[in-house]
UniProtKB/Swiss-Prot annotation:
The gene is rsmG. It comes from the Bacteria. S-adenosyl-L-methionine binds at residues 75, 80, 126-127, 142. It is found in: Cytoplasm. Its EC number is 2.1.1.-. It is an enzyme of class 2 (transferase). This is Ribosomal RNA small subunit methyltransferase G. PANTHER family: S-ADENOSYL-L-METHIONINE-DEPENDENT METHYLTRANSFERASES SUPERFAMILY PROTEIN. Pfam families: GidB (PF02527). It comes from Streptomyces avermitilis (strain ATCC 31267 / DSM 46492 / JCM 5070 / NBRC 14893 / NCIMB 12804 / NRRL 8165 / MA-4680). SUPFAM superfamilies: S-adenosyl-L-methionine-dependent methyltransferases.
Length: 238
């Protein structure tokens, strides 16, 4: 049996980033280190670096999220980046989208315990909920899938002229080049690689931004979205 790793104290940067929600950030870190490890949501080797590699790495995504928008965190897992983002940005309306029950149970417990009234947890896959939940301004994701595959799930959930923000690693530029054709077919009009978290995390967090035009997901997904919307209206009339 592997001995449980100990959660280190929060770094000073965490107090600055999370502000009034610092105590909640500490509680979330404790939940990840305890229940998260016990339920297999996060590896025990990640516990010593929870703050730098996970909570702060995700929280600094807020630097590139517009004010007062709706956000869907696709494949939210244990709540990364959705929960840290929610802790630092109460102006956002955030949906945590996750297909696995054990993960959505954990997310629901965290949301209720921390009093995150601006966060909703939905169990499901992105391709299943398209047309069933309102399109959002921003889709976020971290460690879900290669960019081309992630885009086929995330971009169709966007409103016209929305954007997908994917936390990536050193291969961000390569992934973006490899996914160029797929992104274009999905309605992307602008892409970029951003580095955020100056003075908070080292190395900086890398974000791939994909901005879409009038038809997120392209023609094929526009038709699918319209069909899902019509089906929803029919069911409501019944």
């Amino acid at each position: 049996m592997t001995e449980a790793a100990e959660l280190p104290p929060a770094p000073e940067q965490a107090r600055e980033v999370f502000g009034d929600r610092f105590a909640d950030a500490v509680r979330y870190a404790e939940l990840l280190a305890e229940a998260g490890v016990q339920r297999g949501l996060i590896g025990p080797r990640e516990v010593p670096r929870l703050w730098e590699r996970h909570l702060l790495n995700c929280a600094v995504l807020s630097e590139v999220v517009p004010e007062g928008v709706t956000v869907c965190d696709v494949g939210s897992g244990a709540g990364l980046p959705g929960i840290p983002l929610a802790l630092v940005r109460e102006d956002l309306k955030i949906t945590l989208l996750e297909p696995l029950l054990r993960r959505t149970n954990f997310l629901t417990e965290v949301v209720e315990l921390l009093g995150l009234d601006h966060v909703t947890v939905i169990r499901g896959r992105a391709e299943e909920v398209m047309g069933k939940i309102p399109p959002v301004h921003v889709v976020t994701a971290r460690a879900v899938a290669p960019l081309d595959r992630l885009a086929t799930w995330g971009i169709p959930l966007l409103r016209p002229y929305g954007e997908m923000l994917a936390l990536k690693g050193d291969t961000a530029e390569e992934e973006l080049k490899s996914a160029a054709t797929a992104l274009s077919k999905l309605g992307a009009v602008e892409t970029s690689v951003l580095h955020v978290g100056e003075g908070v995390v080292d190395p900086l967090s890398t974000v791939v931004r994909v901005e879409v035009g009038e038809s997120p997901g392209g023609v094929r997904f526009a038709a699918k979205r319209a069909k899902a919307a019509r089906t929803g209206r029919t069911r409501r009339r019944r």
